């Protein structure tokens, strides 16, 4: 049995403002996500992403999110933005994802009928080189919609992040129910797409820490 750590990792995704990234770093967030998927309301240009990248504190991961982007686009981001992780939300296959010599996470949509057929063995066969998985409600992410957490594959030995409609109000229950390696939030800490709310960011981190305290010490 895979025993999870007591400290749940936190990723704030869809970051578009330097001030929000600085606050995330101050709050001890483990990773910030920068979106390069065409059509996203949180889409960044490479130059804007580079400006944000320069403000990220040491030991905070920078995750570059793609969805069916071309290899040239991804190579440009890898070379200029220097992400520490890549995150793929499209139809990318393992061979493509590992082309860029950067560890990658694969997002798995969980809200549709396809989710009923997802099993651990299938994930490992399709993405044997994935550093971990992100279970989200929909493929594109950032929808603010949850999914049935009981659909999560069992016996996962790779780290996984829970996403999809996670908010300061439900993240405590989400961690208690699924015991994830980490949680991934975007719309749940926003005033509007790409514009984060400092109070919600703080509350989210506080609720994650409270959930971890309960798991470790049995206190609410």
From Swiss-Prot:
One Gene Ontology molecular-function label: phosphoribosylanthranilate isomerase activity
Enzyme Commission number(s) from the entry: 5.3.1.24
Originating organism: Xylella fastidiosa (strain M12)
InterPro entries reported in the protein's UniProt record: Aldolase_TIM, PRAI_dom, RibuloseP-bd_barrel, TrpF_fam
Protein name (Swiss-Prot/TrEMBL): N-(5'-phosphoribosyl)anthranilate isomerase
Catalysed reaction equations from the record: N-(5-phospho-beta-D-ribosyl)anthranilate = 1-(2-carboxyphenylamino)-1-deoxy-D-ribulose 5-phosphate
Keyword tags: Amino-acid biosynthesis, Aromatic amino acid biosynthesis, Isomerase, Tryptophan biosynthesis
GO biological process: L-tryptophan biosynthetic process
Pathway(s) annotated for this protein in UniProt: Amino-acid biosynthesis; L-tryptophan biosynthesis; L-tryptophan from chorismate: step 3/5
Domain of life: Bacteria
Gene3D superfamilies on file: Aldolase class I
Pfam families per UniProt: PRAI (PF00697)
Sequence similarity: Belongs to the TrpF family.
Keyword Cell inner membrane: no
Regions crossing the membrane: none
UniProt keyword Ubl conjugation present: no
Enzyme class: isomerase
Biological classification of the source: Bacteria, Pseudomonadati, Pseudomonadota, Gammaproteobacteria, Lysobacterales
PANTHER family: N-(5'-PHOSPHORIBOSYL)ANTHRANILATE ISOMERASE
């Amino acid at each position: 049995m895979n025993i999870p750590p007591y400290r749940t990792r936190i990723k704030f995704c869809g970051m578009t403002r330097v001030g929000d990234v600085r606050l995330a770093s101050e709050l001890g967030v483990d990773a910030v996500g920068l979106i390069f998927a065409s059509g996203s309301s949180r889409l960044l240009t490479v130059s804007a992403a580079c400006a944000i990248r320069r403000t990220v504190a040491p030991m905070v991961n920078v995750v570059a999110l793609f969805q069916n982007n071309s290899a040239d686009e991804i190579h440009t981001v890898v070379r200029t933005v220097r992400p520490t992780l890549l995150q793929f939300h499209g139809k990318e296959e393992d061979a493509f994802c590992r082309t860029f010599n950067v560890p990658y996470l694969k997002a798995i949509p969980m809200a549709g009928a396809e989710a009923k057929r997802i099993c651990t063995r299938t994930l490992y066969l399709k993405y044997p080189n994935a550093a971990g998985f992100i279970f989200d409600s929909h493929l594109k992410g950032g929808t603010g919609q949850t999914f049935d957490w009981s659909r999560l594959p069992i016996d996962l030995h790779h780290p996984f992040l829970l996403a999809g409609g996670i908010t300061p109000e439900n993240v405590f229950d989400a961690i208690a129910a699924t015991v994830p390696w980490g949680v991934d939030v975007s719309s749940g800490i926003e005033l509007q797409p790409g514009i984060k709310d400092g109070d919600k960011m703080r509350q989210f981190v506080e609720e994650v820490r409270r959930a971890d305290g309960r798991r470790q010490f049995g206190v609410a």
